Amino acid sequence: MCLPFFTSINSSGLFKAVSWRIIESFLLELFFIFYSSFSWSSSLSSSEGTGAGTGTGTGTGTGTGTGTGTGTGTGTGTGTGTGTGTGTGTGTGTGTGTGTGTGTGTGTGTGTGTGTGTGTGTGTGTGTGTGTGTGTGTIWEGELVFFYAECKGYPKIKGVFWVVSFFYDTAKNV
């Protein structure tokens, strides 16, 4: 649908031509205000989302430990000894003697012990995750200006409207 055709200019005066151009610009701006007040002005949309994911990983580790233990043992030994003695006697007499002896013995024993130790280990793991996101966008009003100029049939004005509306929409939507 095109706006009213206000281009039939009377060649008798330049003032009327300029006045009609001002009126057309004003009506076009009113049309944009009316157009933007409805929800269907956002017929174009874009989506951009970010998501966070969770993952699981497995790892292996090595550790070292030290321990101390105590043990008790029992042993048995045998020994041998030799002795010498001297004695004197008279008639029916009595004698006394002394002797000395030495002996050696050996023994063996067994024992048990317990100990405790500590160790540390390190491991690595990998995980994957997925995420979703949503976004919204607005329609580019420059397309409406282009359509309006196309209906008017003015190639030069169409180009000017297209450039101006592009910068206008870009600055407004930043």
UniProtKB/Swiss-Prot annotation:
* Region spans: Disordered: 46-134
Task: Indicate yes or no for the key word Chloroplast.
Answer: yes
Gene Ontology CC terms: chloroplast
The residue stretches assigned to a coiled coil in this entry are: none
| UniProt key word Chloroplast | yes
Region (45 X 2 AA tandem repeats of G-[TA]) location: 49-138
| sequence repeat copies, ranges | 49-50, 51-52, 53-54, 55-56, 57-58, 59-60, 61-62, 63-64, 65-66, 67-68, 69-70, 71-72, 73-74, 75-76, 77-78, 79-80, 81-82, 83-84, 85-86, 87-88, 89-90, 91-92, 93-94, 95-96, 97-98, 99-100, 101-102, 103-104, 105-106, 107-108, 109-110, 111-112, 113-114, 115-116, 117-118, 119-120, 121-122, 123-124, 125-126, 127-128, 129-130, 131-132, 133-134, 135-136, 137-138
Major subcellular location class: plastid
Record's superkingdom?
Eukaryota
A GO biological process of this protein is: rhythmic process
Designated name of the protein: Period clock protein
User: What is the originating organism of this protein?
Assistant: Acetabularia acetabulum
Classification from the root reads: Eukaryota, Viridiplantae, Chlorophyta, Ulvophyceae, TCBD clade
